[in-house]
């Protein structure tokens, strides 16, 4: 796996799924391939994206700045600086300075990542802030190691939270989660169906599923009533794909 592929993988792991994630992935690919070099336009685009947390925007802004060739005097962006200040916690800043001193002696991506993984996400973000604000300088490889370690820390906590939700025994949460997944799958079906005539059936199935979820939410139903809803939808989707000769997609 190349360095930039690894960076893209880690950064995308902290972006919520949805159309915006696909858009960000495309922007990252373009930047890494040298196709998009207008840093100012990129940062303006990033700043106005909805859904993303300030920290995720800060990390993406840091990656774009590292990768795009920019003029010396180009202004640093406030939204990135604010996101990478470690919540203003002096402890984070102290740890960030210690980490920076270690990273300055490091020259490899993996070495930097290994060192950085022993610090908290707050300290890692603060350290990125130091580098972003030109208070410190490290090699691009080392900076990318720091980025990936930060993303790994964030993705770990997101995974723990997700696992808690998936394994919860609370029937109401499980019920709502099944309906959300069914609704998301229906949306994906509609997007995949496109505008061909054969797509009408898939669109109909997806539309009915979304209406059913809306009705279940409106009238309130028994927590077990949503069981199998997403699986039924997936079966319909896969049958449609087979008929269309489309490569089977994995949503599960």
From Swiss-Prot:
Pfam families: Flu_M1 (PF00598), Flu_M1_C (PF08289). A motif (Nuclear localization signal) lies at residues 101-105. It comes from the Viruses. It is found in: Virion membrane; Host nucleus. Residues 165-252 are annotated as: RNP-binding. The keyword Membrane applies. GO terms for molecular function: RNA binding; structural constituent of virion. InterPro entries: Flu_matrix_M1, Flu_matrix_M1_C, Flu_matrix_M1_N, Flu_matrix_M1_N_sub1, Flu_matrix_M1_N_sub2, INFV_M1. GO terms for cellular component: host cell nucleus; membrane; virion membrane. The keyword Transport does not apply. Its main location: virion. Residues 1-164 are annotated as: Membrane-binding. Keywords: Host nucleus, Membrane, RNA-binding, Viral matrix protein, Virion. SMART domains: Flu_M1_C. One of its GO terms (biological process) is viral budding from plasma membrane. It is a peripheral membrane protein. Belongs to the influenza viruses Matrix protein M1 family. Plays critical roles in virus replication, from virus entry and uncoating to assembly and budding of the virus particle. M1 binding to ribonucleocapsids (RNPs) in nucleus seems to inhibit viral transcription. Interaction of viral NEP with M1-RNP is thought to promote nuclear export of the complex, which is targeted to the virion assembly site at the apical plasma membrane in polarized epithelial cells. Interactions with NA and HA may bring M1, a non-raft-associated protein, into lipid rafts. Forms a continuous shell on the inner side of the lipid bilayer in virion, where it binds the RNP. Most abundant protein in virion. When expressed alone can form virus-like particles in transfected cells. Homodimer and homomultimer. Interacts with NEP. Binds ribonucleocapsid by both interacting with genomic RNA and NP protein. May interact with HA and NA. Cannot bind NP without genomic RNA. This is Matrix protein 1. It comes from Influenza A virus (strain A/Aichi/2/1968 H3N2). The gene is M.
């Amino acid at each position: 796996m190349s360095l930039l592929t690894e960076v893209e993988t880690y950064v995308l792991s902290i972006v919520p799924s949805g159309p915006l994630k696909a858009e960000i992935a495309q922007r990252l690919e373009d930047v890494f391939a040298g196709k998009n070099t207008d840093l100012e336009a990129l940062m303006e685009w990033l700043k106005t994206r909805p859904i993303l947390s300030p920290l995720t925007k800060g990390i993406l802004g840091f990656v774009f700045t590292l990768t795009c060739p920019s003029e010396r005097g180009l202004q640093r962006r406030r939204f990135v600086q604010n996101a990478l200040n470690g919540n203003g916690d002096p402890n984070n800043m102290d740890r960030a300075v210690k980490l920076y001193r270690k990273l300055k002696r490091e020259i490899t991506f993996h070495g930097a990542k290994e060192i950085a993984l022993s610090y908290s996400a707050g300290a890692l973000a603060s350290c990125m802030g130091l580098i972003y604000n030109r208070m410190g300088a490290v090699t691009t490889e080392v900076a990318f190691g720091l980025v990936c370690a930060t993303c790994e820390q964030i993705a770990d906590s997101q995974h723990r939270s997700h696992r808690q939700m998936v394994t919860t025994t609370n029937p109401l949460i499980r019920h709502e989660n099944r309906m959300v997944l069914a609704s998301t799958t229906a949306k994906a079906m509609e997007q995949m169906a496109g505008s061909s005539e054969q797509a009408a059936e898939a669109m109909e199935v997806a539309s009915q599923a979304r209406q059913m979820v809306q009705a279940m939410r409106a009238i309130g139903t028994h927590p077990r009533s949503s069981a199998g809803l997403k699986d039924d939808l997936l079966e319909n989707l896969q049958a449609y794909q087979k008929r269309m000769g489309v490569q089977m997609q994995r949503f599960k």
